[in-house]
A protein has these predicted regions:
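Local beta-strand/beta-hairpin segments that build beta-sheet-rich folds
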Residues: 63-64
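Short, surface-exposed beta-strand-loop junctions and turns on beta-sheet-rich folds
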Residues: 23-25, 126-127
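Short strand-connecting beta-turns/loops that link adjacent beta-strands
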Residues: 12, 22-24, 71
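Unchanged
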Residues: 35-58, 68-123, 145-146
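Charged phosphate-binding loop/patch that engages nucleotide di/tri-phosphates or the phosphate backbone
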Residues: 120-146
Length: 146
């Protein structure tokens, strides 16, 4: 059973998302990815966020667990704080940068205004709806299954 860890990162009323063009299918998703066999979800979260954005997580709280049929069975969604930084950028050593270079898939980080988030073609609508509620009313104190 595969797992993924993803980050909700909000700064200055903007949410950090990854815009993907994967084999012609365009959508938005949260930063993050696969949990390796030798790590837990929090370790994967820290690693994936660093690889994909260059940002260092200083705090993370699990807020959602989502069943996701392909390619992961479960996604663990964390509300994250990050260390002070310059702008987020895909790191040259990441899988996303490699795929961008060989022009197989395109991955692009974007800071999206909270109010514009609902208009994005997000990968999973039920998670998008949960995030919208969290952005507007506050995220749950304990993890909720979506």
């Amino acid at each position: 059973m595969g797992k993924a860890a993803r980050a909700i990162i909000v700064e200055n009323d903007k949410l950090l998302v990854m815009h993907r063009n994967k084999q012609g299918s365009q959508y938005y998703t949260l930063v993050g990815g696969r949990v390796s066999d030798n790590e837990n979800t929090e370790q994967a979260l820290v690693r994936e966020v660093k690889e994909e954005t260059g940002l260092d997580i200083t705090e993370a709280r699990l807020v959602y667990v989502e069943f996701h049929p392909e390619p992961y069975n479960e996604q663990y969604i964390y509300l994250c704080e990050v260390a002070p930084h310059a702008d987020a950028a895909i790191q040259d050593t990441s899988e996303e940068a490699f795929l961008n270079r060989i022009n197989v898939n395109v991955h692009q980080l974007q800071w999206v205004e909270k109010k514009a988030f609902s208009k994005l073609a997000f990968r999973t609508p039920q998670l998008q709806e949960a995030i919208i509620i969290g952005l507007n009313k506050g995220f749950p104190k304990e993890a909720v299954r979506v």
